Amino acid sequence: MLDLNKICNFIQLKSLNTFADFHIKGINNIPINGPLIFVANHQAYVDPSLISVISPRKVNFVAKSEVFKFLPAAIFLKSYGAHPIKRNKLDLNFFRWAIKILNKGEALCLFPEGTRSDGVLKRGLPGIVHLAVRTGVNIIPVGIEGTNKNPGASGVLFPTGKIIVKVGKVFKFEKSNESLNRDTVDAILDKIMNNIAELIPSGMRGIYK
């Protein structure tokens, strides 16, 4: 059976090396084994495939549930390791799926902003906090630079310009099933977002300067 993930990664890397000035930094920071959450800034459709390309292991993703209503897209996304998520509301099915993925020792990528930005880091959403604390797994921050100039599907197929993916150091939070108050959630979220912000230029950091 064809491994769609490997095929897509091969094509994407070829495209990046052909059309763009592509750079990867800190790839050795990625643990080879064990449950892992990648957290990254999000500017364009190509961003998830960048995480997949640089990772030495398969990465699971989430995508807005509306995309899965189109059957060909749903088949492709599921084959590529994506799971639907309902935005702007608490999606318990997502949390159950994510915890199951991590309990199996797999890797998951989340974009804490919840949607694409214009290149400047948006305020993070709290969902990542509850998952990080509930599981206590390793977290890898990733900073992506240059993809805001590659919007739409064309930016996935034919990315151009200088694109830099910088991988930071592993960090994690103490595992706990206790309820978190607002101040604790905000403090944990700020730490996650600041770890991402440190990997991108100051002009892209928004409120996390």
Task: Name these PLM-found stretches.
Residues 1-21:
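N-terminal membrane-anchoring alpha-helices
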Residues 3-4, 93-209:
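Non-catalytic C-terminal accessory region of glycerolipid acyltransferases
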Residues 9-10, 17-18, 32-89, 97:
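Catalytic core of membrane glycerolipid acyltransferases/transacylases, capturing the structured
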Residues 17-25, 89, 147-149:
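Short gly/ser/thr-rich secondary-structure transition/capping motifs
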Residues 22, 57-58, 83, 105, ...:
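Secondary-structure boundary/capping positions in well-ordered alpha/beta enzyme cores
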Residues 24, 61, 82-84, 139-141, ...:
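Conserved beta-strand scaffold positions in the cores of enzyme catalytic domains, especially
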Residues 26, 41, 63-64, 81, ...:
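A secondary-structure boundary/capping signal
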Residues 27-31:
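Glycine-rich helix-loop-beta junction characteristic of Rossmann-like nucleotide cofactor-binding loops
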